[in-house]
């Protein structure tokens, strides 16, 4: 996931695990990465659940206009569904990040409204509160942002998930350029997390961002050593190594483990894993393998423009 209004200033948001509702077993899975199949299957449907999943499929391939269209329809059909408001808010937020300033202001307000509605409908929905907190941290006050508002969310989230509360406080500290407090809050999140692996990866991302490669590698090793880690940890580890420019062979190994795990998740669908693998090969100067991975990504998600552009570059 790219840094956007929804992403933390210390590049942590891309790694925070999303405790979202999974699609029903009879529905196609975004995690499998076959976005083309999902879009073909769902495009003719008019029920709210299908429209929400369709919106998320478009969101995954960064077609945010289509994601907004489907997401708005889902919300209109089921206005009391917190999850649908969350995903519509995300689509608005990503669109705002690439829009012209006039449009971005309107979209940002819509983002905030959807996140707030998601929280209002389900006060215990930790991920909605986390996304709203990110908005408050990143948005200017004229658009409803504010660190005090984010701090209030951290207090509210602590009732349900202490680790996420510390993560929000880390975002705030980072925005204040208080690196020691950022690191401390991330370390506290690790201590109280049910799944410490994702928070070790947050810490690894922080170390990478601040040119502490040895600490980064130690944090990655700790994440991968957790007995209850999700397979996504391998994907995230590869992403941090790629961004740091370090240990590409290990990053390749981690991505292959993830792709072979049979436990992929929506935040890291297969087509994105192939795309990241292609990026790593390209950085290594291995254009044949890079091209093969970009083609594998496009075979699952033909509308994913970054892979198309990368393939043209690698061939």
Label for each model-derived stretch:
Residues 56, 90, 97, 134, ...:
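Residue-level recognition of tetratricopeptide repeat
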